[in-house]
Amino acid sequence: MATIHLPPDFKEFLKLLNAQQVEYLLIGGYAVGYYGYPRATADMDLWIGMNPQNAKKIVTILKEFGFDIPDSSIEVFMKPNQIIRMGVTPVMIEMMTTISGVSFEECYPHRVKDELDGVEVNLISLRHLKINKKAFGRHKDLDDLENLP
């Protein structure tokens, strides 16, 4: 696996997710790099499991991370097809509630737990990442597919 360096804000956010036992998966460019095709990425993509406990934990973490958000924001993390963006590239975090081609319930039990830059991370499995990339079908996703093992 490739050596991956994470910006300090990414590391801090991942540590908060882990401390609160949030159900999440690292997807996107960082996952592609982990599986052997390092490439430039403008953000860290996280797929968040949609359930009430997870949603409450995320809102708590966002407040701890310095965002002033109302408790009613919990509802955003309970709706499909949501993308929540924080920060600006290249240190932007995107949290998604749905991704193409796979379900969270199917992927989470098969997650890969590993350490990136000293932080424990839950990654989408290679098989599920490939299914997602194929289903999403953008040019960069198809390029990722060609270069993944």
What kind of region is each of these model predictions?
Residues 1-149:
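Compositionally biased terminal segments of proteins
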